[in-house]
Amino acid sequence: MILKGFVFVAEGVDMSQLDIVKRSSLHSIHVELNASMIEESRWERPNWYINPDTEMAQITATVGICDISPVGKLLVEGDKLDGFCNKIGYKSSVKWGDVVPHSLSEGKMVLCRLSANQLLVVTSAENIDPVTNAITPELTGCLHLTDLTSLYTGILVCGPQSRGLLETLTNIDLRESIFPNMSCVQGRVADVHCTVIRNDRKSMTAYEIYVTRDFGQYLWTGMSERGSDLGLLPFGVEVLGRLIS
């Protein structure tokens, strides 16, 4: 069973002809910061704020934050998740707290084992539909999938000072020995329940933080204020691409 949000349109309207551009819960903040906006995968996103080179330099030196809300967030819940992973081509079990990369012909993804009965599948915005279609046939028994993409805000915190910044906002143990690269956990950041995924970029410590949409601005603002002494800057899609390539 797949649970998704719905957009209601008039009867007879061809949905394929609708040009719907989505915005994250942080859109008004990006506008206030005079971000240069672009459309990517039907999302309006900040391409850059000051300029990409300055933003990249700041991340390399200290820390930066980026709105990654458009990434696909597919939550699979139920028993026998190990069997589900096997059916979609991942032959080992994904242990609680582990994050593992996986690929299908439909697209790349990471599998994040949040609990015994919860697996978060994270993929790129353009691969949400093909990945969903590929894994849906394997939702047997009591397994079901919920598309959280538009319901959750995503914030990437990246740079050598990212751990230090987050440690001022959470009691999650982020020490390297406890929470190494490719780990995930659910806990509280700025006193808000979040999912935290450690997924480093270009050898720089990086955390993906996902929170329900209604707390997105609160979390972004809290991080920005707490990181001001570190020279924290927001960065956009241009720099995000450099961190991936």
Question: Where in this protein do the model-derived segments appear?
Answer:
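Basic, glycine/lysine-rich polyanion-binding surfaces/domains
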Residues: 2-245
